[in-house]
């Protein structure tokens, strides 16, 4: 099966929900890039607290939360994801590449994604 990208509205919705992920000091240290056939997650280490997150652990945890929210949102919107971790060893900020495939959303997918926008 060949990976493809959904329409712009679906991508915007998924990335909007991904941006609601909790982050260390509310820094939102992630960057999402859309390619012709995949989505890419990058760590933005310039947004880490230089005194409080020296080893960028908070950045990585925050990016993982954003990735989770993106995958959950895409599942609810009818897209299955295949995540490739650290796709480019020469570029350590490139944390993940997501291949997307159309797939029917389940009731559980919708329920999980519906919990994302709720304030905690």
Which role fits each region the language model picked out?
Residues 1-120:
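Acidic, surface-exposed loops and disordered segments
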């Amino acid at each position: 099966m060949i990976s493809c990208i959904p329409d712009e509205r679906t991508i915007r919705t998924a990335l909007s929900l991904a941006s609601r992920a909790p982050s260390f000091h509310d820094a939102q240290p992630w960057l999402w890039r859309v390619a012709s056939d995949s989505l890419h997650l990058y760590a933005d280490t310039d947004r880490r607290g230089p005194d409080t997150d020296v080893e960028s652990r908070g950045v990585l945890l925050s990016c993982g939360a954003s990735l989770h929210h993106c995958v959950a949102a895409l599942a609810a919107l009818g897209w299955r994801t295949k995540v490739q971790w650290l796709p480019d060893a020469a570029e350590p900020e490139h944390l993940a590449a997501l291949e997307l495939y159309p797939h029917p959303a389940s009731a559980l997918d919708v329920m999980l994604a519906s919990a994302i926008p709720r304030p905690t």
